[in-house]
Each structure stands twice: as C-alpha cells, then as structure tokens.
C-alpha cells in the first residue's frame, strides 16, 4: 500500500504488509512505470531544492546590496525581498513537544546548500547533520544550556530557533530551500525604494595644492550612518600631514578627533592604523595622484545624490559575482554566479531526462525482443496457418471425390443385382 513519508508526508513510499509485519520497500527497488514515478518525484524534489537555494541567494544578495545604498528619499536602502522561514518536520517517533524554525541569516544566503538537515536532540544538546542522498554528515554537535535556544550555522547560512519541550532522541527534518522559490515574496513595490545612489559623498577641498582625487572603493556595512546622516564619530575628512601620511579625522565639533593614520593612498581605511585597533568604519576609499601636505579630502552623507548610480552599478554587478554555493565543501572558492547556478540546474535536469529517455528506449527494445521470442515459441504464424488451411481444403476436396466415386460404384453394383 502507499503510505505517507515520515516525517515528510509528501515523500510517499510503498509499504509491504504480511500478517502483522510491515516493511517499507526501498524506492530504488521498483522498476517499470511505478519506478518511473518515484524517480521523477526524487529528481523534481532535488531540483526544487536547487531552485530554492538560487532564489534565496539572489534575494539576500539584492537585500544586502540595496541596504548599502541611498534612495531618492535620502534614506538608506531597505530589504527588497522577504526571505521565508521553514518549520522543522517532527518524526512520528518523537515523544516531546518541541518545534524548530530555520531562518536564513541575513547576508549569508550565499553559504546555503540545496541539502536538507536532520536535527537530533541528545541528552545534553543537539546533533545537526546535513543530508546528501543516503549520506548523513554531522556538522554541529554541542551542548545546549537551556531552551528555547538559537543555533547559528554560519557556514550554511542558517540560524535554528529551538523551542523547549524536546526529549532525547527526538528528531526533526529541516528543508530550508525546498519551498523557498514558491514562498519568497517582495518587500516593496515602490521604485523609490531602490537604493541606486551611494550614501557617501567624497570631495576634495578647493584650496588643495595638488590635483589628487578621492574615490569610494566599497561599502560593507552602514554602521557609520544614522538615518540620513553620517555619525560624528565616523571618518569625516582626511588630511595629508607633513610626512605625506593620511590622517583620518572624525566629525566632532568644535575639534575633530584623529582616528588613525594611513601611510598610502590605496584602501586607506583597510590599511590605516586606528587608535582603536578593532575599529572599522564599514567603507573604504582611495586617493590617487600625488598629494601635497595640507591637502584635505571630505567625507559626508550624499544628500540629494540624484546623479549618482554607484550602488545601482553594484546591484547590476551581482549577476557576475560568485553568490551561490556549489556544494557542501567549505572551500573559499566554492561559489558560482547566478547564471552558472541556473545553467547547472538546467544541465543536471537535461542530463537526467536524456538518461531516462535512453533507458526507456532500451527497455522498449528489450520488451519487443522478449515478445518476439515468446511469439516464436508459443505464438501463431498467420502465413503458416493460411498454408495449412489451403492444404486441408485440398485434402477435403480429394476425400470428397473419393467418396463420390465410391458411392457411384456402389450404386452401379446395386443396379446390376436388380
């Protein structure tokens, strides 16, 4: 009989029952039309996971980059998409009442894989395994002090919210990407919410002696901003000192505070020695050209930056950036572009369809051969039967003539006796 899967009811299977004993038949043990249905189901499910992974990676990348720009309303950008969460499916053998919710970590969807996860409660904590076909690999096994608890799987772009009420041995299936392509939605429909401009404006003092220019390299976070302003504690200007160094000052008034100094004009913030060694303004910039002591360069919020499409170009550039994870490996270069990910999914499906078509053609040829072999032994040859009928007809006609001749002879004898 057909039974619902455990814990995923859509993952149906075939159960064999003999008396009081029951057992589940492995999906791979079926052939023919039934086996084709199961193979199609498994192939579609895997492809659905990959499309979900691609959808989440794209949406999160757009959200992250949009929040690094400025809108037409002189505001920092916000999310363009709403990333769906997924609820853990409890196994039927669970005895507790706990629940699990998986959420995509903002900015980390590029670390998502198309795989499902299994969470098992232990006596002291939880064990989390990643599922790859019939292979299960533990990726997290730690104690949990108390529940509810949140577990950060940064390497896989997820956070898991665990409620109280679980018993040791309880298990949950997590499918973070399975329905993502279907349930993902937009957070806004207003074109004005596209943050196409940079929130920073960089200018050179008109009294500078040199022709050196300043340009923005990148923005990685908006910790230096508050609403439509650049925080006073953030870098506001760079002054070339007498040694040719790049002194970085904040926006304190009336006296600016020296935050740090860089010795070269390339990636000034990354290479600067700040008074606070852990300080990171969340952006980087460079000054090109030969500078002169006393030159000043200003950093400010980009009010009314209507002719600035810096962040718009960054949004467009995401299509050629490596934003989708290739597999379960934690290697640094294990990423691909959105186009590559989509092409990979199409290629995978196309290869499987071609393989199944070949298998079907081979099975049809084998069936035809078997039918011909059977008919050659037990079947009827119409030509042979027609030949036999003609022969039987001729024999019948000959027999009829013999009978006729015998009857005539017998009649003649009777006439002679009379």
Question: Which functions belong to the PLM regions below?
Answer:
Residues 1-418:
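S/T-rich, low-complexity, solvent-exposed segments of bacterial secretion/appendage proteins
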């Amino acid at each position: 009989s057909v039974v619902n899967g455990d814990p995923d009811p859509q993952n149906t299977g075939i159960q064999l029952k003999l008396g009081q004993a029951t057992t589940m038949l492995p999906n791979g043990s079926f052939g023919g039309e039934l086996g084709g249905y199961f193979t199609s189901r498994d192939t579609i499910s895997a492809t659905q996971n990959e499309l979900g992974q691609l959808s989440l990676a794209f949406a999160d990348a757009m959200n992250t980059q949009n929040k690094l720009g400025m809108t037409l309303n002189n505001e920092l950008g916000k999310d363009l998409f709403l990333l769906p969460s997924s609820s853990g499916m409890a196994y039927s053998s669970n005895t507790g009442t706990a629940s699990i919710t998986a959420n995509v970590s903002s900015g980390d969807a590029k670390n998502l894989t198309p795989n499902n996860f299994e969470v098992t409660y232990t006596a002291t904590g939880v064990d989390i395994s990643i599922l790859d076909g019939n292979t299960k690999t533990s990726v997290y096994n730690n104690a949990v002090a108390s529940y509810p608890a949140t577990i950060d799987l940064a390497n896989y772009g997820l956070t898991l919210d665990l409620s109280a009420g679980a018993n040791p041995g309880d298990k949950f299936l997590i499918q973070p990407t399975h329905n993502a392509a279907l349930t993902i939605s937009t957070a806004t429909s207003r074109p004005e919410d596209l943050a196409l401009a940079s929130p920073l404006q960089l200018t050179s003092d008109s009294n500078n002696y040199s022709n050196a220019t300043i340009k923005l390299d990148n923005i990685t976070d908006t910790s230096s901003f508050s609403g439509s302003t650049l925080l006073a504690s953030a870098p506001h200007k760079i002054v070339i000192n007498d040694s040719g160094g790049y002194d970085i000052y904040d926006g304190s008034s009336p006296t600016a505070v020296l935050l740090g100094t860089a010795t070269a004009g390339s990636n000034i913030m990354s290479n600067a020695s700040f008074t606070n060694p852990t300080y990171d303004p969340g952006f980087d910039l460079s000054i090109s050209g030969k500078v002169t002591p006393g030159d000043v360069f200003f950093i400010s919020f980009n009010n009314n930056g209507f002719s600035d499409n810096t962040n718009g170009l960054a949004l467009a550039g995401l299509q050629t950036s490596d934003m989708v994870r290739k597999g379960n490996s934690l290697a640094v270069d294990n990423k691909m572009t959105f186009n590559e990910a989509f092409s990979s999914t199409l290629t995978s499906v196309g290869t499987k369809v071609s393989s199944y078509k070949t298998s079907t053609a081979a099975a049809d040829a084998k069936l035809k051969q078997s039918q011909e072999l059977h008919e050659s032994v037990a079947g009827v040859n119409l030509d042979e039967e027609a030949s036999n009928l003609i022969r039987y007809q001729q024999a019948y006609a000959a027999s009829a003539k013999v009978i006729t001749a015998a009857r005539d002879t017998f009649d003649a004898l009777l006439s002679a006796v009379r």
